[in-house]
Amino acid sequence: MPLPTDPSPSLSAYAHPERLVTGDWLYFHLGKPGLAIVESDENVLLYDVGHIPGAVKVDWHTDLNDPKVRDYITGEQFADLMNRKGIARDDTVVIYGDKSNWWAAYALWVFTLFGHPDVRLLNGGRDLWLAERRDTSLAVPNKTSTSYPVVNRNDAPIRAFKDDVLAILGTQPLIDVRSLDEYTGKCTEMPDSPEESVLRAGHIPTARSIPWEMTVDKSGRFRSSEELERLYDFITPNDKTIVYCRIGERSSHTWFVLTHLLGKPGVRNYDGSWTEWGNTVRVPITAGESPGAVPV
C-alpha cells in the first residue's frame, strides 16, 4: 500500500507533488512498512561511506543497463533486481543521489519504464540530507523478495529514439540540457569524463539550450513552480517535447521537472542523446549559441 503524500507546503504548487518528498517526510517514515529507499549516484562509492538508514544501492551502470546491448534491462532482469533489493511492486520507492539527483532522476525514469506505481524523488538529494545533519548508516539492508512481477518495459510514452528526434525537428520543442560549452561545440565531452568524447561537437538543430542546473537552487532543491514555468514558457499544452543530454541522465532530471513538477504532457527523454548523435553518420549538427534551423 502506497505511503501518504508529503503534505509539505513547499511541494503543493507542483503539478504532481506526490512525486517528491522532503527530508522531514522521509525521516518520519524511516523503517515504516511499504517504504523502499534507493540511493543511485554518479560516484558509486558514496553509498559505502554512509547512506540513509535502510537505503539500498542501485548502480545506474551495472544494475539498470544491459551488460551487452546499449539498452536498458529487460522485464525479467528488472524483476530480479527488485527482488534482490527487497522491493515489492506496491512499495513506495524514494530515490535519492548525488549531484542534485542526476542519477536518482535517471533511476526514477527507468522505474517508470517498467510502470512502478509509486516512485518519488527526495528533494535536494544526498547532499541536502547530509547538509541537514540527518542520520546515516553503514549497514547494508539484508532483505530480499520473491514477489516482484515481470513487467514488460514500455518505452513509447516517455522514451525517444534518433528517428523520433529527426521526425520532430522544427515542429516540436527540443531541449538540450547539457552545459553551454557542450551545446555550442566548444568541447566534445564533459570535463571529468574525457573517455566519453564524441566525434562531433555541437547540438541538434532547433534545440534550445536550457542546462539542467537552472531547475535547482543552491541547496539542490527544485526551484518553485513559478520559476520553472518561466523557464519553459515556450512549451504549449499540445507540444510533445523531447529532451536530451549526453547519455540521458541529465535529461532524465529535466524530464522529471517537465512531467511531474509542471505537468507537461507527452515529454520524452532521448537517452541515446549526444553520445549517439555526435557519433552517427549523416545526421544534422550545428554549433554556436543559436538553436539553428531545420536542415533542408
From Swiss-Prot:
Keyword annotations from UniProtKB, A to Z: Repeat, Transferase
Active site positions: 245
One Pfam family hit: Rhodanese
Chemical reaction(s) catalysed: thiosulfate + hydrogen cyanide = thiocyanate + sulfite + 2 H(+)
Any GO molecular function: thiosulfate-cyanide sulfurtransferase activity
Annotated residues for binding of substrate: 250
SUPFAM superfamilies: Rhodanese/Cell cycle control phosphatase
Domain free text: Contains two rhodanese domains with different primary structures but with near identical secondary structure conformations suggesting a common evolutionary origin. Only the C-terminal rhodanese domain contains the catalytic cysteine residue.
Class of the enzyme per the UniProt entry, highest EC level: transferase
Sequence ranges assigned to domain Rhodanese in this UniProt record: 31-138, 168-286
SMART domains: RHOD
UniProt KW NAD keyword: no
Lineage top rank: taxon: Bacteria
Top-level taxonomy: Bacteria, Bacillati, Actinomycetota, Actinomycetes, Mycobacteriales
Classification via CDD domains: TST_Repeat_1, TST_Repeat_2
E.C. numbers: 2.8.1.1
Species of provenance: Mycobacterium leprae (strain TN)
Protein name: Putative thiosulfate sulfurtransferase SseA
Family matches, as InterPro entries: Rhodanese-like_dom, Rhodanese-like_dom_sf, Thiosulfate_sulfurtransferase, Thiosulphate_STrfase_CS
